[in-house]
UniProtKB/Swiss-Prot annotation:
Protein name per UniProt: Uncharacterized lipoprotein MPN_588
Membrane topology: Lipid-anchor
Cellular localisation: Cell membrane
Region (Disordered), start-end ranges: 31-51
N-palmitoyl cysteine lipid attachment residues: C23
Length: 531
């Protein structure tokens, strides 16, 4: 029997009995346009054939039966997931890489933005400049570590401006293009593109709208070396690798409010996300931390942007940066984007990020339950070490990942989601429980082989973000960790960055009297505000 673990995309990791490959999607790249030389971007025909995405070796529709291209209504169970979540696109000279991200934190003047979550096309600015304290608004997006591996910015924060071996990034791997995408339809879409130049041929009632930010993102946090590995050993299983990881990272996107595209990102993408974030509990009530055994009797809702066939009625529209837009970011230690893609290239792609949720029309089921063996599958107990769908990643010694040229072993705990095999590009999607708490982040698919034949390929995997201390409710729980707020067992957690940068999440920590959120206040942190 063989266990294969697919993250479904550009990153493939081999082990003796398991394979870990990325649930982000990748395709060969083209030569991007240079805004500095060409001025405003107009569609042109590429001189070479447009390459097709190569997100997976196996057919993309392997058992795919999920709902796509449906914007949730206000009462829909997926509405908050939709508002929070975006398609992420990182491009370098070699590859075009897609993943999914969601609003995790922010820093900026909310009052000046009039944040109410409503959709307001922002071709003309909706910002009350008289109220602005600064011309910047910073957004922090959560995704998988294996997606954040695609971000290679030589003006990033330390230690991320070089690889893990302290070597400069190669020219072919440096990030040159970044965009946020969201699926829009109907009047919302028509209003959006009606004022855009060069979009007259793209009148459609459905589209993935991608907006190129003015800056290349930076790395706020990676869940690398986040625990003492000895605290999470399983049956004395050891590893030769010196580091550990959870498949979780946070990237920083700095928005220049004088830049037209950044204004659009803020008003049309970020404002609804902030509204959803606050509706779900605004930091302190949003992120679940509960004993592992309490995950079992839950239903989990998943929404992301896997790369699949776009269909005849779905366009892929790129709102690119232009030379005429404001790119004055020298005072903010940002790396401006000077490259973009041709709309003609975008139009020819037959596989794009497609809005997908885990509703299944074939049996009218919504959400996902944790994995449970069927009566005829008792043999799985000898292949997958799990407790009613909860796994300790320390039991899989060869689940490893290379991040910025250093290999790490996966640690912490995760969920096995039955009948939830989202394809590549969905990596980083948030998992929200029936209790409206965000508990984990989706990262891949488990494939199980019996006698050389594929027996199961429908088990989705997610990484739990927080586990409580003193957990006695689960047979596989040995220690706690908290990737967001920290605890005594967690060496590396996001709240340290939030405190150094005085973000919204840290402001909520300061307001709280609950000790589970205030661990960072008991620790010394190192200010990391340099570039």
């Amino acid at each position: 029997m063989r266990l294969q673990f697919k993250l479904l995309g550009f990153l493939t990791l081999l082990g003796t009995s398991t394979i870990l490959s990325a649930c982000a999607a990748t395709q060969p790249n083209f030569e991007p346009n240079n805004i500095e030389e060409s001025g405003p971007i107009t569609p042109t025909t590429p001189t070479t054939d447009v390459p097709k995405p190569t997100a997976e070796v196996v057919p993309v529709n392997r058992g795919f039966h999920f709902q796509t291209n449906k914007v949730p209504s206000e009462s829909d169970v997926f509405k908050h997931n939709y508002d929070l979540t975006f398609s992420l696109n990182f491009t370098n000279k070699s590859n075009d890489i897609y993943g999914t991200g969601w609003l995790f934190d922010w820093k900026g003047d909310e009052k000046a933005l009039g944040i109410d979550g409503s959709f307001v096309p922002s071709i003309t600015s909706n910002i009350d400049n008289s109220l602005l304290k600064d011309d910047q608004f910073t957004v922090y997006l959560a995704t998988n570590l294996h997606v954040a591996d695609a971000l290679r910015n030589d003006q990033d924060y330390e230690p991320y401006k070089k690889d893990q071996n302290k070597q400069d990034f190669t020219e072919n791997t440096k990030t040159e293009f970044f965009s946020l995408g969201k699926y829009l339809e109907g009047e919302q879409l028509k209003q959006y593109i009606s004022k855009e130049e060069n979009q007259s041929a793209n009148q459609t009632d459905k589209a993935l709208v991608s907006i190129q930010a003015s800056n290349i993102p930076k790395t706020a946090y990676t869940a690398t070396d986040f625990v003492d590995m000895n605290s999470y050993s399983y049956n004395n299983i050891t590893t030769s690798l010196p580091g550990n990881y959870a498949d979780f990272a946070v990237i920083e996107v700095n928005l220049n409010l004088k830049n037209q595209r950044d204004q659009q990102i803020l008003h049309d993408f970020v404002k609804p996300a902030i509204k959803a974030y606050k509706a779900l509990g605004d930091t302190l009530e949003l992120f679940s931390a509960k004993p592992l055994n309490q995950f079992i009797e839950q239903n989990y809702y998943l929404l992301g942007y896997p790369v699949i066939n776009k269909g005849n009625n779905t366009a892929n529209l790129l709102l690119a940066q232009q030379k005429s837009f404001d790119h004055n970011n020298s005072d903010h230690n940002q790396k401006s984007q000077w490259f973009t893609k041709d709309q003609s290239y975008i139009n020819k792609l037959d596989r794009i990020p497609v809005l997908t949720n885990n509703y299944r029309a074939y049996n009218e089921s919504t959400g996902s339950q944790l994995f449970a063996n069927q009566q005829n599958e008792s043999w799985l107990n000898g292949v997958v070490i799990q407790d009613k769908g909860v796994v300790n990643f320390a039991s899989f010694s060869n689940f490893t990942l290379k991040y910025h040229e250093k290999r790490f072993q996966q640690y912490g705990y995760g969920l096995m989601l039955n009948d939830t095999n989202f394809p590549g590009g969905s990596s980083g999607s948030p998992l929200i429980g029936k209790d409206n708490k965000l508990n984990s982040i989706y990262f891949g698919v488990l494939e199980i082989y019996q006698s050389g034949s594929l027996a199961r390929n429908d088990i989705g995997m997610s990484q739990i973000l927080r586990t409580p201390q003193n957990d006695k409710g689960s047979s596989i729980s040995k220690g706690s960790y908290d990737l967001i707020f920290g605890d005594k067992n967690t060496k590396n957690y996001y709240a340290k960055f939030a405190k150094d940068h005085q973000t919204h999440l840290y402001q909520k920590i300061k307001e709280s009297k609950d000790e589970q959120f205030r661990f960072v206040e008991t620790q010394e942190t190192t200010n990391n505000l340099g570039n």
